[in-house]
Design a protein with these regions (language model features):
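Short Pro/Gly-enriched coil loops immediately N-terminal to beta-strands
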Residues: 107-121, 211-215, 257-260
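Ligand-binding clefts/hinges and TM-proximal coupling segments of bilobed small-molecule sensing domains
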Residues: 144-158, 234-301
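Short, low-complexity disordered leader/linker segments with a strong preference
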Residues: 1-29, 340
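Bilobed "Venus flytrap"/periplasmic-binding protein-like clamshell domains
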Residues: 30-56, 60-61, 120-186, 195, ...
Length: 340
């Protein structure tokens, strides 16, 4: 009887061992990250993301691909939705139906939020200390973005909202061209980006520092309600509070409202949930100081700002990202609520 019991136990043990074999390893999955131009801040941050994925995932592998620009990022994610994620811009809200910019290119609504990346905070600047508000630009020459660029739509919408679009002469060159034309005296004011690490670390950046070799630069701000109204109407204008003297102790004595066209990681809605969950996990678990090694602006890739969306009303999170955030009790936030 004892022998039978021993044999029975051995058989049961062997069967149990067979039943608790390790689950087969998840097949390796390769993705590409559309990183834009190599000179853009989101390109090195995307290189960082690829490195983090390759180091921290047991089954996911990533490689960064340069594109013609941030619009190229979205285009390739749209064309190859199961292979690419990318860095998107809030300005691509104009891809939506009903927007002339998107209608010309072919509308697209499949992008889904994963995590916040970087700022593109801006206001109007001038050498003319007499121009103190947007309405003072009437009769002046103003540089906005390049013709055909998505952010130009937002620049013109701001001028229209303040009632001066039909009262100014427009020049279309973008930020670098606008800086050159302002310095050469060919325009009176230009839209200009400056460096911004969330929530409130501001520096002038190279364009403004170069302009100051000619003379002091003055800053023309907006107001929060107007920017929020524009955002609700599907323009890329996230309000940003710039405290007094944050840009310059002499030429910016008063606080002002600028606006941000944030960038963020996206995947097409057709990208599988498991892959995006894993990407989101790695983004979340990688601390800000690791991101900042790839670009200084990565310093705001922290738990406050990673889940901050350009608009909770206008965007959806990818199901894989939302699953990760929900499982870990992480609330998706409106970026505008964090920048005032």
């Amino acid at each position: 009887m004892k022998k039978l019991m021993v044999i029975g136990c051995l058989i049961t043990g062997l069967l149990a061992v067979g039943l608790v074999k390790e689950a087969p390893a998840k097949p390796t999955r390769n993705i590409l990250i559309a990183g834009g131009r190599t000179t853009s801040p989101w390109y090195p941050l995307s290189q960082g993301l690829a490195r983090f994925i390759n180091q921290k995932s047991d089954w996911l592998r990533a490689e960064v691909v340069s594109t013609a620009g941030i619009t190229g990022n979205l285009d390739i994610a749209k064309e190859k939705p199961k292979d690419y994620i990318g860095v998107d811009s809030f300005a691509h809200i104009h891809y939506r139906p009903g927007h002339p910019w998107g209608e010309k290119r072919g509308t697209y609504t499949g992008m889904r939020f994963i995590a916040n990346v970087s700022s593109e905070t801006q206001c109007l600047i001038t050498y003319d200390s007499g121009i103190k508000k947007v309405q003072d630009l009437a009769g002046k020459t103003v540089d906005v973005g390049r013709k055909g660029a998505a952010n130009t739509v937002d620049h013109m919408a701001v001028l229209e909202k303040y009632g001066v679009l039909d009262k100014v002469k427009l020049v279309y060159t973008g930020y670098g061209g606008g800086a050159d034309k302002l310095k050469d005296g060919l325009v009176d004011a230009t839209m200009m980006m400056f460096d911004h690490i969330y929530p409130d670390k501001f520096t002038k950046g190279g364009f403004i520092e170069n302009l100051e070799t000619k003379g002091p630069i003055y800053y023309i701000g907006f107001d929060r309600d107007t920017l929020l109204q524009l955002r609700d109407s599907e323009y890329a204008t996230v309000p940003v509070w710039v405290p007094a003297r944050a840009m310059d102790p002499n030429t910016q004595p008063q606080a002002l409202w600028a606006y941000d066209i944030p960038t963020f990681y996206i995947a097409d809605e057709r990208m599988d949930e498991d892959t995006v969950y894993e990407i989101t996990r790695i983004i979340w678990e990688t601390p800000a100081d690791e991101w900042a090694k790839w670009h200084p602006i990565g310093a705001h890739m922290n738990e406050t700002f990673k889940p901050a969306m350009p608009s909770l009303k206008l965007y959806k999170a990818h199901p894989g990202a939302k699953k990760f955030y929900d499982e870990h009790g992480i609330e998706l936030k409106d970026l505008a609520d964090l920048l005032h």
